[in-house]
Swiss-Prot record:
Belongs to the IST3 family. The modification Phosphoserine is found at residues 149, 274. It comes from the Eukaryota. This is RNA-binding motif protein, X-linked 2. Keywords: Isopeptide bond, mRNA processing, mRNA splicing, Nucleus, Phosphoprotein, RNA-binding, Spliceosome, Ubl conjugation. The gene is Rbmx2.
Amino acid sequence: MNPLTKVKLINELNEREVQLGVAEKVSWHSEYKDSAWIFLGGLPYELTEGDIICVFSQYGEIVNINLVRDKKTGKSKGFCFLCYEDQRSTVLAVDNFNGIKIKGRTIRVDHVANYRAPQESEDVDDVTRELQEKGCGAKTPPSSPPEVSEDEDAKVTKKPKKDKKEKKKKKEKEKTERPVQAELPSCSRSKTVKETDEQSAKKHSSKPSERAQKSECRERKKSHSGSPDGRTSCRGRAEEPEWEAKKEKHKHEHKPSSRREGEEKSRDKDRGRSSGTHSSRHHGHSEGRSHRSRSRSRSRSPDRSHRHKKHRYSHERESFHASDRRHY
């Protein structure tokens, strides 16, 4: 069969599998799963082993190569065999490199089921023998883990023990810190409870004192209902703090009223003296004048304080009694 027809057939198989979505297990590549060798045909004669490795190493690490040459001349015959490190790289190489052109020539890439190494001959060089025996791949380290000495094993085993001890210590510290934190809010709560109890006790103690003051005021009001002294004394005891605060406010307001009261008192004194010298007929007129002066003083100073009213009331009584005595 012509090599170009083989290239076309391989490409058609790959296209059908892609269209149908065939799994890897059922694919035609699975027939060569035990072989990591591929065949390369139609290569240019100028290519060397290094050139071939550069092109085909795109899809995997190349382990071995066998470029077939003429025994007499040593020239390439245009085909070779490649071995990949991973068998799956052969599938990628066949699918992607089959049918490509290198230096104007289409190459063919296909799987190799059973590769046989060439027979040894006397004309073969030492370099080719080493390649055939050892291959051209780089030496990779073994996949198994390196052996560890007994001392290193002991160190590795000691570390987790220390970690466990540290974890236990941390847990113990956390346990000791938690009850301390729980005690702190309890102390603060007890303080707040004590403060509330003290406030409530003060309130209860102030209430009976206020009630006692109110009851005393009521009794004094009943006994001294006619006298203004009783009212003032009761109010003074119950409203001492309020009265002291109002005193300072009304000082400036009562300055002009105090002057007027002084003038009126002097007038009342003069009138009382004159009433003693006159006869009994003029006694009624003096009383009328005194009543008028009272009404005038009340209308002029409506904002007088309780003390001034009390003083005025006592002074008028004295003047009235003095006039009566002189008359008799």
